[in-house]
Each structure stands twice: as structure tokens, then as C-alpha cells.
């Protein structure tokens, strides 16, 4: 989607048996509303027992010179302008800011699109999960969804963690995905 989601880097803390070192800040409006500043002591919870997010700031522990977070104007991945979509129904701009890059020009957007393309919600290709997509991207084996159907299996077989059997299994899964019923 190209959404730019700010994340708080926090000292590791155990929440419900899980060590948390990152917490979502949701969007710029939430940061402003909660007056979250760089260096603040914050209270974190795991929303729905899953995603850690900043609940509040301990203002008693705030140091006077803590700086306000300045939301970037350009995508940290590709440098394109960051925009807010206008919602015609509400007649307001959405809270979520997005990279304005189109197609597959932004690396982060391209990788996420490919991950979705091969996911259980789309082609459901066994053996081609998120980490594999990232590895294939890093090795320049894929840049677009259609590249999945033109993979160089000789190069894949020579990658660390891959061999003839895993490569053969991937080839089978990709060919099987062509027969969508």
C-alpha cells in the first residue's frame, strides 16, 4: 500500500511473555495527539495481544529538550514525495501517509506487492514465503510478479539453504499455481 508507519524503538521490555523492542506509532496525527517525543518514557501495550503500540507518555519523566518527531516529506525507501489521500466521503485527508511512487518504482512497495502475489490470499505458492521473496529480491532474481514464472532455477539451487530438491519443489509449486481453479 505504500503506507509510511512510524515505529518507536524502545528498550526491550517483556509484555505478556513477549520481548518487545518496537511499537507502532500509527501515524503523524497519533504522534501529535499523544505528544510523543524522541527520548520519552512511554507506556506500551499489545493491541489485541499482537501488535505493540504506544499507549501514552510519562510526562513526569520527560526532559525539557526532548525533540518533537518530524514526519518525513519523502519516502525513506525511494525518495518519492509522501502524500495523504483525500477521502471524498468524509471530506478529509486520511491519517495514513503514503509513498506517491507508482507501479514498482519503490523497492518496499514492490517487495510487498510480490509477497502478496505469492501469498495464500493470492497464488498460494508453497515455498515462496516472505523471507524467500526478500532473498530473491536481494539476489535480483525477481523485480515484478511475472518474474516468478521466469526464475533461473540454476541460480536458486546455488543459493545458501537451497539445493536440487527444494528448487524442484519450488518449481513444482509455481507451475501448480498456474492452474487456478
Where are these regions (language model features)?
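RNA/tRNA-interacting regions in translation and RNA-turnover enzymes
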Residues: 1-181
Amino acid at each position: 500500500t505504500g503506507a509510511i508507519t512510524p515505529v518507536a524503538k524502545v528498550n526491550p521490555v517483556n509484555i505478556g511473555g513477549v520481548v518487545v523492542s518496537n511499537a507502532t506509532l500509527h501515524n503523524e496525527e497519533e504522534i501529535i495527539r499523544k505528544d510523543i517525543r524522541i527520548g520519552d518514557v512511554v507506556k506500551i501495550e499489545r493491541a489485541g495481544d499482537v501488535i505493540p503500540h504506544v499507549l501514552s507518555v510519562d510526562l513526569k519523566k520527560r526532559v525539557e529538550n526532548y525533540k518533537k518527531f518530524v514526519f518525513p516529506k519523502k519516502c525513506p525507501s525511494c525518495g518519492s514525495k509522501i502524500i495523504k489521500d483525500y477521502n471524498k466521503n468524509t471530506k478529509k485527508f486520511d491519517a495514513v501517509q503514503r509513498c506517491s511512487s507508482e507501479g514498482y518504482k519503490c523497492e518496499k512497495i514492490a517487495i510487498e506487492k510480490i509477497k502478496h502475489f505469492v501469498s495464500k490470499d493470492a497464488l498460494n505458492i508453497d515455498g515462496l514465503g516472505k523471507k524467500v521473496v526478500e532473498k530473491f529480491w536481494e539476489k535480483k532474481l525477481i523485480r515484478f510478479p511475472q518474474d516468478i514464472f521466469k526464475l533461473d532455477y540454476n541460480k536458486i539451487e546455488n543459493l545458501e539453504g537451497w539445493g536440487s530438491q527444494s528448487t524442484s519443489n519450488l518449481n513444482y509449486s509455481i507451475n501448480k499455481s498456474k492452474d487456478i481453479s
